[in-house]
Amino acid sequence: MAASGSFPLLVEGSWGPDPPKNLINKLQVYFQSRKKSGGGECEVVPEPGNPARFRVLFSPEDVRQNVLERGNHELVWQEKGTFKLTVLMPTDPEEASASKKSRKESPEEESKTKEDAVKQGDLDITHSPSSGSEKTEDVPKECENISSMVAFENLPEKVSEMVLTILVENISGLPSDDFKVEVNRDFAVAVVTFQKPIDIKKFIVDCISHRSNQQLQLAPRLLETTNVVRVENLPPGVDEYQLQLFFENPFNGGGRVARVECFPEESSALVEFCDSKVLDTVMAKTHSYNKMPLSVFPYYPSLGTALYGEEKPLIKLPASFQESLDLPLWKFFQKNNHLIEEINNEMRCCHCELTWSEINGKLTIRPAATLVNHRLSIKTWQRDASAVLSGIKSKYGVELFEVCSPVWDIIKHELESGDDRVLVEFEKESLNIAGKSEDVQGMSQKIRELIESTTEKLRREEQSLKEKVAISPGKHYLLHHSGFLKDLSKGFPEMEISYDATAQFLYLKGFRADVYKVKCDIQEKVFSMAQKDVQVSSEVFEFLQQVDSQRLSKSLFEAQNILAIYELKGTALFLVGSSFKDLAEAETKMLSALSHKQIEVEDKEVLISNGWKKKVHPLQKRHSSCATIIVQNELTSETPAKVIVTGCVKEVNEIHRQLFEYLENNMKVERALKIKPSLIVDYLRTDKRLLSKIKKAHVYVHFKPKDNPNSILLTGCKSKVLECMNLVKEIQDSVCVQRFQTDKAGVRHFFKDKESYYKTEIGRQFGCVIELEEDREEKGEEEDGEEEEGEEEGESSINEQKCHLQRDIAPGVKLFVLEEDLSRFPVDVVVNAANENLKHISGLAQALSKAAGPELQTECDQIVKEGGVVLPGNAVISKAGKLPCHHVIHAVGPRWKGDKVLECVSLLKKVVRQSLSLAEEHRCRSIAMPAVSAGIFDFPLELCVANIVSAIKEHFQHKRDTHTLKKIYLVGLPAKVARAFAEAVKTTYKDSLSHTAFPSSLKALVPLGKTPQKQGSLLVSPEGLRIRLVEEGVQNATTHAIVNSISPDLKLNKGPLSQAFLEKAGPKLQEELTRSGQGVSVDVGTILQTSGCNLNSRHVFHVVPPPWKSNNSAWSLKIMKNIIRDCLKTTENLSLQSIAFPAIGTGNLRFPKPEFAKLIISEVLKFSSRNQLKTLQEVQFLLHPKDHENIQAFSDEFDKRNNGDPSDKNPKAEDTQGIYGSLSSPTLGMHEMNIGPILFQVATGNIIKEVADVIVNSTTLTFDLKSGVSKAILEGAGQNVEQECSLLAKQSNHGYIVTGGGLLQCKNIIHVVGGNDVKKSVSCVLEECEQRNYSSICLPAIGTGNAQQDPNVVAKAIIDAIEEFVQKKSVQAVKRVKVVIFQPHILQFFYDNMKEREGSPAPPKQSPAKQSVMSKIASFLGFPKQASPKKNTLVLEKKIEHTVFQVCGSGVDSVNKTISWLKELITKEQLSYTNDDECVSDFDMEEYEKLNEIQKELNITIEMNQKKTSIQVSGISRDVIKARDEIEGMIKSIRLAKEKESQADYISTYVEWQYIDKNITQCFDKMTNMKLEVAWKAKKKDTVVQIHNQDFTVDLSTNTATAPQGQTFTVQRLVKAEAEIPANWSDMKQDKLLLVNLQTSDPEYNMVASAFRQTCSNFFIEKIERIQNPALWRRYQAYKKSMDEKNGNVRNEKHLFHGTEASSLPQLNSNGFNRSYAGKNATAYGKGTYFAVKASYSACDTYSRPDTNGRKYMYYVRVLTGNYTNGNASLIVPPSRDPQNAADLYDTVTDNDKNPSIFVVFYDNQTYPEYLITFRQ
C-alpha cells in the first residue's frame, strides 16, 4: 500500500515470472529520471503476491500523470538487455484516489482508512468475480487453531501438480499465490498448504463433493499437525543420543525430544519432539553438525514421508555390486553383442545399469538414474536386481569336456564350421561349450561322439608309418608314365602313395615293413635314371620356362617312345631319361626340334596397332603350346624393339615368315640425313621439285628437327625412305655454298631486325637462301669449320644425348660426359672394357661385339693368337666392324683386389693412358670411353671414374706435343655411371685455369727468370713438376711415397707424426722399420725405407731430421737440405710419380716454420731444374688442418712465389751489377720486375681499390684537384682527408703533403704536385716511406692526367727515381712499388722502359755539378732541347665485330649476285659521323667510360684520331645518330663547364667570398665563389653552398652559413681591386653593353681608321663603333695582368684585326671570342681563333662576309699574344715551352714566329673586341 501522500502506479515488464536481481534499484533510477521516464521522486516496492509486478509510489500527482502520458517505457539494462515496461493505474479506485486524502490524514487516520478499506472490500467480495476470498469470508473461530494443510491421498499418476492447483483454486476461490502444493509420487499423495486462514473443514467437504473429485477419486483429509522432523545429510557416525542432545539445545531452537530413530544407510534420522510448537523454532534456524550443514524437514507419520517444500529430498542411491559369470559363458556373450544388449534392456526395467568387463567374467550392476523417482524400491533394489539376473543366467549353460591335443587338432575343423549359437573353445586339453541351454545340450552330444571316434582313429594310426621321398616333378613323371608307381600300388594295396609337386616329395603311408620296402624300390629306380645338362640359347631357355615341361616333353618324346623329360633348375636345363639311351635320343630330339628367330622393329608403334594384334593373336592361339612370340619393347627409346619367335622349328619358321612379311609392309622408319652446312637444309626446303617427289613416295619430310637441327628427317616405308635419301644427296652435291664476311659495326643487328624480309627478298630475286652464321661456341663447331666425317657424326649425336657435363681440359680439347649406348655412338674410336683373352661374352664387350658383327671377334682372336693374352693395364686396337666408328681399343683393366688398391689404381690409369696414346697414334680426333673395370671386374665405381678422369688430365698435362684428340667422351649407362663421371670431372678440374694457363704455356719460376703457374695452392716448375700445398692428415695421403719423421731409436710411438703413421699403417710398419734399421748406424740425417702397409702410399721414407740450432743454423739447414734432396732422388729412382712431405722437424725439434717452408720449396725447385725427371710428377706438402702456423708459413711462401717475389735473398742495395731483374707478366695487364730489393709493378686498374701502406695522389699546387684520378682518390678517402688537405696546403711544404688514409685501404696518402718534376716527387715519396718504415707504395702515373705530361717521360722518371733511391742508400723498409694506370695505352710506355732495362746494371751516377756542366756545354754548342712528344689522347676500347653470312644457291652466279646485293645493302645502312671540336681533347675519365658504354650498347664503333683530335663514329644509321647526340651533348657540357670556369676565374679576380672556421679564414673554391657572387648581385635572400662536403644555407643579409644540424659559419665578401674602366668610355647608365658610334673627328676614330686604311684603302668606312663591355674588359685585364706577371718585360698585347659576318656580331659583342668561336673559319695553325696583323687579310669575303646590303664587318681587337711560336693544324692548345716542364706553355701560335702575320688564340678572355668597323666596297 502506498505511503502517506503517494500516488501509485503498477509496473509490469518483459522479464517474465522470475525478475532479475536488483531490478528494483534499476526501476528506482529509471522512474526518478525526468529525462528517461518523465517521473521524479518515487519509491519502488514489489507487488504483494505477484513477484513479477512492482508498485511505484510517486509524491506529486502530476508526476504520476506525466509518466502515464508518456507512451513507451523501456528499461535499458546493459548486462541483461532491454525490457519493455507497461505502466497501469491500480484497479482499486479507492487506492488510486487515496492521494486526495493523504496530504491531510495523520498516521492514525491512515490506519483507520486502511481498515475501512478492508471492511469495504469484505462487503464487496461476494460481488467481485475476481476476488480471492469469495468463499472464505466467514471463517469460524474454531478453525483458527486447526492445521492449514490438506492431504490428498490416492493421487493418480495422471493428476499433475497444475491440475491439482486449478482444482484447489476452483474449490477454495483463492489464487495460487495463497497456497502451496507439494506432490509426492512415491506415496501417491499431495499436500496443500494454505497461506491465508481458511475454513479447512468446509474446504475438505467441498473437495469431496466437487464433481471433479468424483472423476479423480481423490481422498482429501486434514493433515495433522506433526511433532516429528526428518534430519538429512547427517555426518557418518552420528547416533540417536547425539541427535537428542543437539535438538534439545535451545540454541538450535529445540525442545524436549521424545524419540530419535537413525537411518545410517540414508544418512538421515527422525526426531520426535514432545511439543509440536518446537517445530516452528527448529525449522526457522539453519543447522550444521561438525561444520556439515543439516537439512531439517517436517515429517508426517501418517504420510510416511517428510514434506520438502521447494527443496528436493536428498536421496542416496544404493552402492553397485558385482556378479561373476563362467568364463566360457562370458566369452560367449562377448562374441554376441546383441545378447548383451538384450540383457542390458531387461535389467533396465529394475533400474539397473550393467558394465561388462573386457578382460574377465565380472559383471558390475549399478543403480540407474531412474531409481531416484522410486524411493520405495531403493531398499530392496540389490535383492531384486540379483534375482532378475539369476533368472537370466538360468537360460544359458556351459559344458566341459576333457580332450587331448591330437584329438582336438583333428576335430577342430569340423567344430569351427558350426553355427555361432554356441561358443566352442579349447584350452589346456579342455573343451568348453557355452550358449543357450538348449543349444548347448544339442552340441554336447555331437562333440561327445566326435571325440570318441577320433580317439579311436588316432589309436589305429599310431600303429602305421608315413615316409617321404624327395623326387623332382620330372622324375615323378617318368615313374608314373613308366608304370612303376602303378605296379607298386598293385603289390601293396593298403599303402597310400601320394605326390606333392610343390614340395617335390612322394609320400608313403602304410605298415612299417611295407613302407620301407617300397621306399627302397623307388630310390633305386630314381638313381638308375640318366641326367644331363644341355646348353640351349637364352631365347629357347626362356621359351621352355613359359610352357608346361611335362606337356612339351610328352609332345616331343612320347611319339618316338622316348621315356624322358626336361627340367629347369635356376638357369640350367637338365634332360632326364629313364635310361642313357632314352637320354641320348631325347637330347638329339630337343636340339633339332627347338629353334628361335628374331626381327628388329624400328617402328614401335606398329607393335601396338590393331593390325599387329590381329596378326599375332591368331598365331599365338594356334601355336600356344609349340611356340611363343615375345616383343622386347621395354628398353630405352633409342633401342629398336625386337620380336623374338621361339619354339618348335616348324612353327617358328611359319610364324617368323608371316610376321616378317607383315612388318616389312607396315613398319614405318625414320632416317636422319646429316646436311652440312645446315644452310643447305633451308635451300632444300624451298626446292619444290624435291618436295613433290618425296610427297609422291608417301614419305614425310621434317627439316631441321629439334634434336638434330643440321639434318633432314625422312619418315615412311623403309624402301621409299631410302629412295628419297638418295634423291636428297644428289641435290645436296649439286648446290653452291659461299661465305661472306664483314667487320662493319651493327651488320648482324640490322640484318636480324629484318631477317625475315631479307631472306624472302633474296629467295625471290636470286633463288638463294642466306644464313647469319652464329658464333662458333654457340654452334659447338670447330673454328676452321671443317671436321672429319666421324667427328661430325659424333658432334651431331651430342645433341641427341643426355649431356651431363662439358669442360675444356686443354687448349682445343673438350671433355664430355654422356649417358649413351656405346654400340651406337658415332666417334672415331670406342674403348671396349675387355678381358685378357679378348672374348666378348658379357657386358659391354658382348654388346659391342654383337653390334659390330662376327669380324670383330675374329680379329680379336687373331690378336691373341699372334701376341698372346693381353695383360691388365694394356690395350690393343682393332677395326670396328659394323660399329659407327673407325676403331675399337680393347682396354684390359685390372680386376679389383681390396688388398692391392694402389696396384689396381696404377694399372687402371695405365690402361687409360695407353688407350689415349693408341687413339692419337691412329690420328683419331674423338674417343668414347666407358667406366673400364667398373662392371664385372668389381672396381668401385667412384674410385674407378675418379682415376680414369685423373689419368686423362695427366695425359694432357704432361704430353707437350700437339694432340690429335679434340673430344673425349666419357660414356656411362645406366645414368648413375654418367653422374659419377660428372662428379669426378668437377672434382678433378675444379681448380682448372683457362686455356692460356695450361702446361704448354706455363712460365718458369721467378728465380729462373720466369713465373710459375698458380692453381690455388699450387706451383708448377718450368719443367712441369707440380708442387701442391695440401691440408690433410698423413693418414689420408694418396701419394706413391710419403716421408715420416722418427727418432734415432726407431720407435714409432714417439712423436705425434710417427704415431699417426703407426695408427693407420698398423704394427707391421714398426716391424718393417726395425728390420730395415738392423745393422745401420741410425743418426741425424738417416733415411730408412719401408712399405706403406695399410697406408694408401706404397712407400714410407723414415727420416731422422736435425734439431734447430740457433747458434749453428747452417748445420741444421745443410742436413735438412740433404734429407729433402735424398727423398726426392729415391722417389725418382723407384719410378714413383708422387711424394708427400709433412712439416718434419718443425715440432719438438723446433725448426722455424717459415725457414722450413722456404727451404723445402727452394730445394724441390732446384731438384726439378737440375735433374731430368722421368717419373716424378707431383710433390705435396702435407700439413695437418689444425697446424695453423705451418699452413700460414707455407701459404706465405706460395703467395710470394706466385706474386713474383720468390727470391731467397734480396740483392744488396750497393750491388750495381744486374740491379734490374727479369721482366715478367704474371697476369693480363700487369708487368713486374725487381729493381734491387724493390719489386716494381705496373698494372691497369682502379687505385682506390688497392691495398698498400701508402697511396700517392697526383694533384695541383693548391692540393685541391677535383678531377680525374685525384677526384676519385679524394672522394674515396672521405671528407676528413679533404679537410686535412686544405689545412696542410696553407702551411709550408716541400712540394708534397701527407694526410691520413681515410676510407682507403692504406695508412697514409701522400699528395704530390703532378706538374712538378716527377722524379723528384717520387724520390720524396720513397724517402718519406722509408722513414716511416712503410713497405708498400701504390701511385698513379703522376702528371699524365691534368698536368698533361708525356707518359714516356713520366715512366722513365719514376723508374729513375727508384733506381737512384736503391743506389744511394741501403733500403730496409720499402719492398714494393706499384704504379696503377687508368688509361690502358700508358701501360705500353712503362713496359717499353722496363723492357729496355731488363737485366741491365744501373748506369754510373753523375754528380749534379757534372750534369749541370754537361747541359751547359750542350747548350753552348747549340744542341736543341729534346722536343716534348705530344700528349697522348684518350684511347677507347677497340670494338671489332665480325659478321659472317652463308649463301646457298643452285649455282655460283646466283650466289655471287646475292652477295653483291648484300654488300650494297650494308653500305646503304652504314653511316659515319666525325666531330673535331677542340673540347674532344678535354674528354676525361667520365667521358671515356661513357663512350665505351655507348659503344657497347649501340651497334657502332668509335675511334679517336689522336693527330686531328677528332672522334669518329661508324655503324648503323640510327645508332650513329644516337651516338652523335650523346657525344655532342658531352661536348656541350664540357664547353659550358669551361665557360663557367672562365667566368669563375674572372669573378675571383675582383671578389673573394670567405668563411671563418675555428677562427681561421677559409676561402671558397672559385665555383662556389661565383655562385655566391651571382646570388649577391641578384639580391637573393639566401643560397645553398657546400662546406666540408655538407650543404649550408648562406643568408646573404646576415652573412651566416647554417647547416641542417644547426652548425654555423660566418661568411664575408672581400672585394679585390678591379680593373679600371677606360676614362674615355661614355657613361653606360648601368647597361652591361654599349656600342658608341665614334665621330670622324675623334682621335680614336682616326687611330682605328688609319690602321685599317694601311692595307684596305680601297674600302669605304661607314662607321666605327667603340664596344664598351665592362665584364669582358675586366676579364681581359685580369688575364693581361697574369700574363704580364708571368712573362716579365715581354710586350704581351697587340692590336689585330678579325673579320666576321653580321650574324656573329651580337655574340662577339657580349661574350667576346670564347672557345665556341674557335676554328670557325680556319684550322691551319691550330684549332683556335685567328687574328690578322693586316686588315686586308680579314677583309676578304671568306672572313668578313658581306650582308644583304653589302656591308662588311671587322673588329679591331686587343690580343694578348705574349710568347708565341709556330703553330700547326693538330694543335688544340699551345705547345710546351720547356720539355722538362710540360705545364709551361706558349701563349699563342703564329704562322711565322720571325715575321708573324696571323696569331691563333686558344683561351677565353685573351682578347677584347675594342672597335667594330662597318665598311663596304
UniProtKB/Swiss-Prot annotation:
Domain Macro, residue spans: 802-989, 1014-1202, 1227-1398
Binding annotation for a glycoprotein 2: 1034-1035, 1045, 1057-1060, 1145-1149, 1187-1190
Compositional bias per record (Basic and acidic residues), positions renumbered to this chain: 104-125, 1197-1215
Pfam families given in the database record: KH_PARP14_1, KH_PARP14_2, KH_PARP14_3, KH_PARP14_4, KH_PARP14_5, KH_PARP14_6, KH_PARP14_8, Macro
Binding residues annotated for a glycoprotein 3, in chain numbering: N1246, I1247, S1258, V1269, G1343, T1344, G1345, N1346, A1347, F1382
Region listing for Disordered, in residue ranges: 87-141, 774-801, 1197-1221
Catalytic activity, reaction form: L-glutamyl-[protein] + NAD(+) = 5-O-(ADP-D-ribosyl)-L-glutamyl-[protein] + nicotinamide
Effect noted on mutating P1384S: In strain: Czech II
Record-annotated WWE domain positions: 1539-1617
A GO biological process held by the record: positive regulation of interleukin-4-mediated signaling pathway
Induction record: Up-regulated by IFNG in macrophages. Down-regulated by IL4 in macrophages.
Known tissue expression: Weakly expressed in the thymus during development and in adulthood. Expressed in macrophages.
Enzyme class of the recorded protein, top EC level: transferase
EC annotation from Swiss-Prot or TrEMBL: 2.4.2.-
Keyword NAD carried by entry: yes
Phenotype upon changing S1682G: In strain: Czech II
Protein name as it appears in the record: Protein mono-ADP-ribosyltransferase PARP14
Gene assigned in the entry: Parp14
